[in-house]
Amino acid sequence: MADGLNRVHYNPSTAQLVEFALLRGEGELTANGALVAKTGTRTGRSPGDRFIVKEPSSAADIEWGPVNQAFEPGAFEGLWARVEAFLADKELFVSDLEVGADPEHYQPVRVTTQYAWHQLFARNLFIIPEEFNRQDKPVWQIINAPDFVCVPERDGTNSDAAVILNFAERKVLLAGLKYAGEMKKSMFSVQNFLLPAQGVLPMHCSANVGKDGDTTLFFGLSGTGKTTLSADPKRFLIGDDEHGWAPGGVFNIEGGCYAKCIDLSQKNEPVIWDAIRFGTVLENVVMDEHRVPNYKDSSLTENTRAAYPLEHIAQRKEDNRGAEPHAVVFLTCDVSGVLPPVSILSKEQAAYHFLSGYTAKVGSTEIGSTSAIQSTFSTCFGAPFFPRPAGVYAELLMKRIESFGSQVYLVNTGWTGGPHGIGKRFDIPTTRAIVDAIVSGELKNAETVHLDTLNLAVPVAVPGVDTNLLNPVNTWSDKALYAEYAQKLAEAFTKNFAKYQVSDAIRNAGPKA
């Protein structure tokens, strides 16, 4: 992009970007030093406006449909050119960054943004390398033009905004969107497409490591506890959202964290609380008259966020990498109150529950979502971000688990004693105690009871957890009603799973309707 008519700031520092954002009226400074920015009507991702260019080099490997919508190559060229022309006389911010903290599996990316705060977000969430693109790989380009207005009749979009990935040209176009999470999830989708061809499993998970080098992964949708549970004062954080699992180890795809802020408290989430300071971007967080953030205020959205670099976390793995995981945790948020707080899975059950991705949308990250909590099945615990057919990722997971001998657990961070509205949600200290027992290895060979309808093995005891909580039927006053809800959930699993072509061993590993 030419910088004759416009001013272009290359690789600007955090302080410069905060200054630019304030001078340009893009945000305000909070009492804790963070920058607050508002994203307008779109306070979450816009899945209906996400497209992938349908071109010969990648078309056969993508699962086309409502998640991966096809976009014509010619329409993309025209729209890219119009956005470039729109930005030609604008002040711009450009950084050379990387996605993937692995010397073999990184992707270099040049990020061009119209807004200073979007550039700060990109520099917080992507990796700022000591030496850019050491292997001289072809460079991806992201252009983010939030003030460009798409015209569906002219541009081939579904609305006034679009997110479009082009694998052949290594381009990502974001137009008409202020919500910054689209940038990180776009490059996550890119890596989710590229990594399997290199024998690497891309994962929507968080990861941390103990003092002895033992790695734990936490899979889950937004709001189920990935960030909270991986930010453990007793362990070292690798990352909170996106990772690759290669033979020999796991690596963070990012260089920062994107934590949910709703109801954030210093007591329950000290690591996240302390990370919010100068350089952090707060999205759609409301402040009082003294500029103190009010994390309880959801008047703009339930999906309030903090974007900060990993350097803001004291206890972290500085190379953003770890050994292969001894423990893998699938976080599910069960709104029916039926699932136990922890189950120990066989490798076939792991494949079944990975493909099912049963959970709930909690303070959903997608626009148009209400604050109502709905159950959902999200393949691989992140269906919106995986371009290839689900079986590709499930096979890679099975391969890695078998090869290393990882133990997989299903942990319910949702409700017990009744469905949402009647029962109560498991509190964070209870879930932390369960996770402590998992990472210490105490549950790997624990004595279990079998729940027939759910087809799950549940430990009879977990240190620090009320034994009555472990078998969910004990927490329901009406046992017959529990059995009815359990049967309904088993039927929902079976109905959802019918679409998958898998072995009988995997199909039979699910609940028994």
From Swiss-Prot:
Residues noted as binding Mn(2+) in the record, renumbered to the chain: 185, 204, 241
Cellular localisation: Cytoplasm
EC number: 4.1.1.49
Cofactor(s) essential for the protein: Mn(2+)
Pathway: Carbohydrate biosynthesis; gluconeogenesis
Chief site of localization: cytoplasm
Gene3D superfamilies noted in UniProt: 3.90.228.20, Phosphoenolpyruvate Carboxykinase, domain 1 (3.40.449.10), Phosphoenolpyruvate Carboxykinase, domain 2 (2.170.8.10)
Binding note for cofactor: Binds 1 Mn(2+) ion per subunit.
Keywords, sorted A to Z: ATP-binding, Cytoplasm, Decarboxylase, Gluconeogenesis, Lyase, Manganese, Metal-binding, Nucleotide-binding
Ligand binding (ATP): 185, 204, 220-228, 269, 305, 431
Binding-site positions, substrate: 45, 179, 185, 305
Nucleus is among the record's keywords: no
UniProt keyword Cell inner membrane, yes or no: no
One GO process term, biological-process aspect: gluconeogenesis
GO cellular component: cytosol
InterPro entries for this protein: PEP_carboxykinase_ATP, PEP_carboxykinase_C, PEP_carboxykinase_N, PEPCK_ATP_CS
Pfam family, one: PEPCK_ATP
GO molecular function, one term: phosphoenolpyruvate carboxykinase (ATP) activity
Catalytic activity: oxaloacetate + ATP = phosphoenolpyruvate + ADP + CO2
UniProt record similarity statement: Belongs to the phosphoenolpyruvate carboxykinase (ATP) family.
PANTHER family associated with the record: PHOSPHOENOLPYRUVATE CARBOXYKINASE (ATP), PHOSPHOENOLPYRUVATE CARBOXYKINASE ATP
HAMAP family reported in the protein's UniProt record: PEPCK_ATP (MF_00453)
Protein task: Involved in the gluconeogenesis. Catalyzes the conversion of oxaloacetate (OAA) to phosphoenolpyruvate (PEP) through direct phosphoryl transfer between the nucleoside triphosphate and OAA.
Subunit field text: Monomer.
NCBIfam families named in the record: pckA, PRK09344.1-2, PRK09344.1-3, PRK09344.1-5
Protein name: Phosphoenolpyruvate carboxykinase (ATP)
Species per Swiss-Prot/TrEMBL record: Shewanella sp. (strain MR-4)
Name of the coding gene: pckA
